Amino acid sequence: MAEAVFCSTIGRAYERELEHLLFFNARQRTVRAGVVEALERYGAPSIVHENDALRVIVSGCPGTQCLFALAASGDPPQLLGSVIYMRNPVDTLTILHLAVSDDTVTEDDQNPLIVVRLVDQVRKLARSIRGVRWVHVLYSQSGQFQIPIRPRGGHSFRSGPKE
């Protein structure tokens, strides 16, 4: 896996790649139920132009933020993935949508590394926000789960529906 850099906005040149990543991603079928639930609960993501940059917002959730993973090399660097998240409730950063580029997925239809790196970046951000104790992932191939920001007792995550 190529090295990645993470940023909250990307240039307008990435608009087609981002549209494909968010709206036409072939792997969405593997987490379809979770995607549908997230859309019904929080609203649809949309790409917005801000000066010369692109951001992603979610219609029903003011305050959503996005983080993009770009290849550290290349001209231009390849868009590897994105994660859309928000603070909800006050002690949790909730990951609403997580997408990985078709080009970064391995032959066995998985690329856990870029997914793990995106989630880890959200976890690092959460550590810097006072009062945030959890990162909640709404959907994955194994269902919902929560990751503690400061693990206690050797447990690294809690699976199942959020309580």
Task: Report the location of each language-model feature.
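Conserved catalytic-core motifs of GNAT/GCN5-like acyltransferases
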Residues: 152-163
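Short, intrinsically disordered/low-complexity patches at protein termini
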Residues: 42, 118-119, 158
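Short glycine-rich, low-complexity/disordered patches
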Residues: 30-51, 130-141
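Acyl-donor binding region in acyl/amide transferases
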Residues: 88-152
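A conserved beta-strand-loop-helix scaffold within acyl/acetyltransferase catalytic domains
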Residues: 37-92
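Hydrophobic, Leu/Ile/Phe/Ala-enriched alpha-helical segments that form helix-helix packing faces
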Residues: 22-26, 71, 122-130
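Conserved N-terminal entry element of GNAT/NAT acetyltransferase domains
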Residues: 1-30
